Amino acid sequence: MTASETVAFVDKMKPNRFSVEEKFRWLTDIDGMIVRELIDTHEDSPLDAPFAGYIPGRDDDTELIAPAPYDSLYRWYLEAQIDLGNMEIAKYNNSKGLFNQAYLTYTDHYNRTHMPRQRGGFRFSERRKGGEHDALSSRT
């Protein structure tokens, strides 16, 4: 789903007073979170270039990072932001719960299909002095 398709769908499902620019900023926020929390921590990044966010007009036809069937997370994130901006806390809680579930489903899928990056390694070194660990032999 593209950024403009997502915004149009949310505007149809939940008419609101928020600008396209604000919604693109929210999409930038959620995809930025996906990049930081998932893509940057795993091998084989699906991105061709560093993530620079979305700008209306320039990125209308840009595909969002989470593919179908996981792209519902964008709808629920935008709806949650709209509800929060309108101070409709009960609706926000519902939308945020639906977003959290959709995001968790996507992260589970991503974690199953991509290897985590190996960051350094653990080296265990045991130096012995007289048959005891150094730490133990330094005690008197």
Where are these regions (language model features)?
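Structural motif
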Residues: 63-73
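Short, surface-exposed beta-strand/strand-loop-strand elements in extracellular ectodomains
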Residues: 90, 97-98, 102
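Short, charged, amphipathic alpha-helical segments
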Residues: 24-25, 93-97
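Short helix-capping/linker segments at secondary-structure and domain boundaries
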Residues: 82-92
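Conserved short "hinge" loops at termini or chain/domain junctions
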Residues: 1-63, 101-140
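Generic detector of ordered secondary-structure context
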Residues: 22, 70-71, 91
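Short, hydrophobic/amphipathic alpha-helical patches that form generic packing surfaces
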Residues: 72-84
